[in-house]
Design a protein with these regions (language model features):
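Acidic, low-complexity proline/glycine-rich segments
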Residues: 1-7
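Active-site flanking loop/helix segments enriched in acidic
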Residues: 7-31, 50-54, 67, 117-130
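Amphipathic alpha-helical segments within well-ordered protein domains
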Residues: 15-16, 40, 44, 140-147
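Short amphipathic alpha-helical interaction patches enriched in hydrophobic/aromatic residues
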Residues: 18-22, 43, 163
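Alpha-helical phosphate/pyrophosphate-handling elements in metalloenzyme active cores
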Residues: 24-105, 148-151, 156
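Divalent metal-dependent catalytic cores for phosphoryl transfer on phosphate-bearing substrates
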Residues: 96-172
Length: 172
């Protein structure tokens, strides 16, 4: 690790530092909060499945059997699924517990580069508008910004990789 893992307060400071206007901050930061919230709900569900993996019935749909025969499809339909976790249903048992805090930080920072691809950034009172041509660059712009600010690569990669940039065929 060569950089720092930002706290929630530092994440807000990173957003405010790069935001060209209050309107831009409100749009991008609110979106990031929504994504982080949904991500954390999914992780809680996955971790609940992992924690309860020993008590799930063998035919529970959350076990995610890769073999699909007529009998297993019938069994999966008739099996009792695990009750919802924080309003989330479905999913499959992950191979290990997932890091909810990492998902929270990644979700809050994943779109931080969008501040650098506005065509109209709201600073002059005009409505916000993204540059369609440059929008694909927002992941790389966010990655570079976070690294320049001293954020660790393990966190900065959330900005870079959520658009697919930086992923190899093997990663996918």
């Amino acid at each position: 690790m060569t950089g720092y893992i930002p706290t929630l307060e530092q994440i807000d400071e990173l957003h405010r530092k790069i935001a060209p206007s209050e309107a831009a901050y409100e749009l991008v930061h609110t979106h990031c909060v929504i994504v982080a919230t949904i991500g954390c709900q999914i992780v809680r569900r996955q971790n609940a499945l992992f924690t309860r993996r020993c008590t799930l019935s063998k035919d529970a749909p959350e076990r995610g059997s890769n073999r699909r025969t007529e009998n297993t499809v019938d069994a999966a339909v008739s099996a009792t699924p695990m009750p919802p976790t924080v309003g989330v249903t479905g999913g499959q048992v992950p191979p290990r517990l997932l890091d909810e805090h990492l998902v929270l930080i990644g979700g809050l920072l994943h779109d931080i580069g969008t501040y650098r691809v506005f065509k109209h950034d709201g600073s002059d009172g005009e409505p916000l508008k993204f540059s369609k041509k440059r929008y694909i660059l927002h992941g790389l712009k966010g990655y570079e910004y976070l690294l320049d600010e001293g954020v660790d690569e393990s966190i900065a990669q959330f900005a870079r990789n959520h658009t697919g940039v930086g992923l190899t065929c093997e990663d996918v």
